[in-house]
A protein has these predicted regions:
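H-loop (His-switch) and adjacent beta-strand-loop-beta switch element
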Residues: 219-236
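ABC-family P-loop ATPase nucleotide-binding domain
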Residues: 1-21, 232-237
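ABC family nucleotide-binding domain
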Residues: 12-13, 19-218, 225
Length: 237
């Protein structure tokens, strides 16, 4: 039977029959399907965690939602717009105005200060607002580090910068890819609490992927990515 998404007057994110494949290594001409998702939906302001081990397509899935990579087929409807109908420039604009992304491994620019890294989260959206960037650093407890460079910060502090940058463009959806993977237990707990709190405060929905059961246990709405992604149980041609 086809998987149906329950009716909701307005979803922030709606996915239908989303697929992505890559060429198999070795040049044999075959394709390896990484993502094959029949249906998924996320309400405004929702906080959902996806459980999945490394190599299961979680990062590719988030990159599809962010428009960083193009889908092979299917539909991604984000904030009322069809993402898959847009070219690369259109996807970039939609991402800049709608999505915040907390990358695995922080992904901070080492040649820029902490404040500049946060401002870069605004650069392709509504324009740089230094006052907002400073306020975000205040919110994540790094106001006194605004002139520092990422290499001068601890791992926990770098993750806080990444959180501030993700919120810089006032997103409606925050994507978080293994956001605690490089942190010790204490910093992981603090980072997770911070991410969830700032999303609640701003009204942004949160979609987080992780394999850490301690992280996943914090979410009332936790789903198994292996059950969602049919590519893990089928062989693509």
């Amino acid at each position: 039977m086809p998987i149906k998404v329950p009716f909701r007057a307005m979803w922030l994110l709606e996915i239908s029959h989303l697929t992505k494949s890559y060429a198999r290594p070795g040049g044999n001409g075959g394709r390896h399907r990484v993502v094959d998702i029949a249906a998924f939906a996320l309400a405004p302001g929702a906080q959902v965690a996806l459980r999945g081990e490394s190599g299961t397509g979680k990062t590719t899935f988030l990159n599809l939602l962010a428009g960083i990579v193009a889908a092979d087929g299917g539909s991604i409807r984000l904030d009322g717009r069809e993402l898959t109908a847009l070219g690369e420039a259109g996807r970039d604009r939609l991402r800049a105005g709608t999505i915040g992304y907390i990358f695995q491994g922080f992904n901070l620019l080492q040649g820029h200060t902490v404040l500049e890294n946060v401002e870069l989260g605004m650069a392709f959206g509504r324009g740089v607002d230094r006052g907002r960037a400073a306020a975000l650093l205040q919110r994540v407890g790094l106001a006194d580090k605004h002139r520092h460079y990422p290499r001068q910060l601890s791992a926990g502090q770098q993750q806080r910068v990444a959180v501030a940058r993700a919120l810089a463009n006032q997103p409606k959806l925050v994507l978080a890819d293994e956001p605690t993977g490089n942190l010790d237990r204490r910093n992981a707990r603090e980072a997770l609490d911070l991410i969830r709190e700032v999303c609640r405060e701003s009204g942004a929905a949160l979609l987080l992927v992780s394999h850490d059961e301690r992280v996943l246990a914090a979410f009332e709405d936790m789903r198994d990515f292996a059950g969602l992604n049919r590519a893990l149980s089928t062989t693509a041609s």
